[in-house]
């Protein structure tokens, strides 16, 4: 092996799965040193490695499940947390977390993270997570909070506003976009997607709101093409915005071209739907251009099926524990060894971490909105429901509820940091072969 040219050795190692690469470290001292100490090898290997799968309850949970790449087993890799956790996004090796309502950006591979001075209670679907690769070894992140507001003067139009955070503070973008009224899609398959510099939110009518956090330009992307009614998933594949349209018979993959046109790039026969009878529920959960994940729920349990686009084959990826609730968020996770601007080691984060606090003052409302809110309620309108039962009203910026004193007292800095470290440790343990 010592006589083998380094570039040939790298090509061999790059094609190994994580488990096999870990075994290679034990065969030769020089290979072990090369894998563990050469940063260029790490950057290249993690750029080629396949995606792992994270999933957690959509309403938050103290248990996070992780399915590492190329390891054949059930979804047994899980970790208990001290606090309620949500995963709000996963992009380029980073994860955006909400720990008891406190936002945190973390890189599980490098074990660096950062808390943001903002607490989120509800409306997590409206948060977009963007990560840019500045150079081979450096990344930076941005978080965008989108709000929707029905126009009082024209109830057939909706206006969107954007608030941006780069790690230090929140700023209100001067950009707004007004378009035909339709609410942002919530619930299943509603997570925003970041690709080619733009964050994308799917609306109920199938159109997409796009916003560039760097240029602060917004646009509406239409998706009116020949697709049958079915399940929709907004995602990214081969560095293009992708829309999955799935029925019991076929799963169609559409990609957005640079000219704004959608093209059909893949047609997949939905074989697994008919193999999982009696079937209670199914849905397309994730896609990255290389694989497609479909979840099937039957009377005997819940199973994730994986379609390999290169091999054109379906296979069972794993089963989900029976104690997991049906409504779950799934994220494909691809680790990154890059240094991220703003992320810190644990000893520095402990000092900078914000305690849960009341929310900042809401954004100023447009004058016509103030006038509308102070107008007398017409007699024909029903009396408002109690706050606990009322439906959320359109606001210029949906403001999360502040934590109560009791909740603040029960959430300590050490507990929140412990939960973040446990999440990163769950992923990092699987990839410890290279650290």
Curated annotation (Swiss-Prot):
Organism: Arabidopsis thaliana
SUPFAM superfamilies on file: F-box domain
Keywords from the UniProt entry: Kelch repeat, Repeat
Protein name according to UniProt: Putative F-box/kelch-repeat protein At1g20790
Family annotation (InterPro entries): F-box-like_dom_sf, F-box_dom, SCF_F-box_component
Domain called F-box: residue spans: 1-49
Lineage: Eukaryota, Viridiplantae, Streptophyta, Embryophyta, Tracheophyta
One Pfam family, short name: F-box
Entry keyword annotation includes Protease: no
Superkingdom classification of source: Eukaryota
Kelch repeats: 192-238, 280-335
Keyword Transport in record: no
């Amino acid at each position: 092996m010592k006589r083998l040219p380094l570039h040939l050795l790298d090509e061999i190692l790059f094609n190994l799965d994580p488990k096999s690469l870990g075994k290679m470290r034990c065969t030769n001292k020089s290979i072990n040193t090369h894998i563990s100490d050469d940063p260029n090898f790490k950057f290249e290997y993690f750029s080629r490695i396949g995606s792992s799968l994270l999933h957690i309850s959509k309403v938050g949970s103290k248990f996070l499940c992780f399915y590492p790449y190329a390891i054949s087993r059930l979804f047994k890799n899980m970790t208990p947390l001290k606090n309620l956790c949500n995963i709000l996004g996963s992009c380029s090796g980073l994860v955006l977390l909400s720990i008891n309502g406190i936002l945190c950006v973390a890189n599980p591979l490098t074990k660096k993270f950062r808390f943001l001075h903002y607490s989120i209670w509800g409306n997590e679907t409206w948060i977009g997570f963007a990560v840019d690769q500045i150079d081979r070894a450096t990344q930076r992140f941005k978080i965008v909070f989108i709000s929707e507001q029905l126009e009082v003067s024209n109830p057939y139009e909706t206006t969107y506003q954007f608030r941006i955070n780069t790690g230090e503070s929140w700023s209100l973008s001067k950009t707004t976009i007004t378009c035909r009224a339709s609410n942002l899609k919530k619930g299943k398959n509603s997570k925003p997607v970041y690709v080619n510099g733009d964050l994308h939110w799917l609306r109920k009518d199938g159109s997409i709101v796009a916003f560039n956090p760097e240029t602060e330009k917004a646009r509406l992307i239409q998706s009116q093409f020949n697709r049958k009614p079915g399940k929709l998933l907004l995602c990214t594949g081969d560095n293009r915005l992708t829309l999955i349209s799935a029925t019991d018979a076929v799963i169609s993959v559409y990609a957005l071209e640079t000219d704004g046109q959608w093209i059909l790039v893949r047609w997949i026969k939905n074989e697994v739907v008919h193999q999982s009878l009696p079937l209670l529920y199914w849905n397309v959960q994730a896609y990255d251009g290389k694989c497609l994940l479909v979840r099937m729920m039957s009377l005997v349990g819940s199973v994730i099926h994986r379609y390999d686009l290169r091999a054109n084959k379906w296979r069972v990826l794993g089963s989900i524990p029976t104690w997991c609730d049906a409504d779950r968020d799934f994220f494909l996770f691809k680790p990154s060894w890059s240094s991220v601007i703003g992320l810190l080691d644990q000893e520095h984060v402990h000092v900078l971490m914000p305690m849960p606090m009341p929310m900042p003052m809401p954004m100023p409302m447009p004058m016509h909105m103030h006038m509308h809110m102070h107008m007398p309620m017409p007699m024909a309108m029903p009396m408002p429901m109690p706050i606990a039962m009322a439906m959320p009203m359109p606001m210029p910026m949906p403001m999360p509820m502040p934590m109560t004193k009791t909740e603040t007292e029960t959430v300590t800095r050490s507990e929140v940091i412990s939960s973040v470290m446990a999440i990163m440790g769950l992923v990092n343990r699987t990839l410890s072969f290279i650290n």
